[in-house]
Regions:
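A conserved beta-strand-to-alpha-helix junction within the catalytic ATP-binding
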Residues: 82-95, 147-150
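Flexible helix-coil linker/loop segments in the cytosolic histidine kinase module
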Residues: 14, 39, 43, 51, ...
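Short conserved segment of the HATPase_c
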Residues: 168-172, 181-193
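Short alpha-helical Gxxx[C/S/T] motif in the catalytic ATP-binding
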Residues: 208, 212
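Short alpha-helical segment of the dimerization/phosphotransfer core of two-component systems
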Residues: 57-62
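Glycine-rich ATP-binding loops of the HATPase_c
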Residues: 220-226
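Short beta-strand/loop element within the Bergerat-fold HATPase_c
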Residues: 143-155
Length: 243
């Protein structure tokens, strides 16, 4: 088990170092494009300006992809075990996302959540990804309405999910009124780079939910999704009190 942990940590460190090296040329490329555009903007035709816009969009997409791969590697690393009050973690996440929430006029209701043991950093990433997902995949005419609720797992549900009967678990649900998805894709959406909707309409690396899956797996929990096209989604987490 220690060898597996060491290997995962080494992979995570390698990917993080590689991501740092990849970001450097991307920064330089972005600076050079901006300089050329600023210096010669009056000489640029409408087509040339459009090409510059596309180049910048590609640079940002590459940055997003590199960052996503870094987070995916981190999520695969060993999960530490410290006290994590999910109420605090979710509130801190909402505070960081405040501008995005205001811009989208989103409403987020959060019921009392449990305290669990696990990786504080990974749980922050988990709820950040789920909330970003809920806000992003919405109909443009409708303001996002998100609810996070929680309850202890009972005996029957433990049996259904084949969970140890002597261990305490919590079920946490993240509901939204977004564009939803076809239920046949409920497992597929947790695979890396899977996109159910056009990239032109909804930006992103396609890694957010696969990172969520890695984090929950690290904590020996369960995550699954339920969707209804054009009506919304529900992401359910089954998390142990300790892992």
């Amino acid at each position: 088990m220690d060898e597996i942990k060491i290997y995962k940590d080494q992979v995570s460190d390698f990917v993080e170092a590689a991501a740092h090296d990849l970001h450097a040329p991307l920064r330089k490329l972005s600076i050079l494009v901006d300089r050329v555009f600023t210096k010669h903007t009056e000489q640029f035709s409408a087509d040339a300006k459009e090409y510059v816009t596309r180049i910048n969009a590609c640079i940002e997409e590459m940055r997003s992809l590199v960052d996503g791969l870094t987070e995916l590697a981190k999520a695969d690393a060993h999960a530490s075990s410290v006290d994590c009050d999910l109420n605090i973690i979710v509130q801190q996440t909402l505070d960081v996302m405040n501008e995005e929430i205001k811009e989208k006029r989103a409403k987020v209701a959060v019921d009392p959540l449990p305290a669990v043991k696990g990786s504080y950093i990974q749980y922050r990433q988990l709820f950040k990804n789920l909330l970003e997902n809920a806000i992003k995949f919405t109909n443009k005419e409708i303001s996002p309405d998100i609810c996070i609720s929680s309850e202890p797992i009972g005996k029957d549900e433990k049996s259904f999910f084949n969970l140890p009967p002597d261990k305490k678990y919590y079920k946490i649900e993240v509901d939204d009124n977004g564009i939803g998805f076809n239920q046949v894709n409920a497992e597929k959406i947790f695979e890396p780079f899977v996109r159910l909707h056009p990239k032109a309409e909804y930006e992103g690396s396609g890694l957010g939910l696969s990172i969520c899956k890695k984090i929950v797996d690290n904590h020996r929990g369960i995550i699954y999704a339920e969707g209804d096209e054009d009506k919304g989604s529900r992401f359910t987490l089954i998390l142990p009190e300790t892992h």
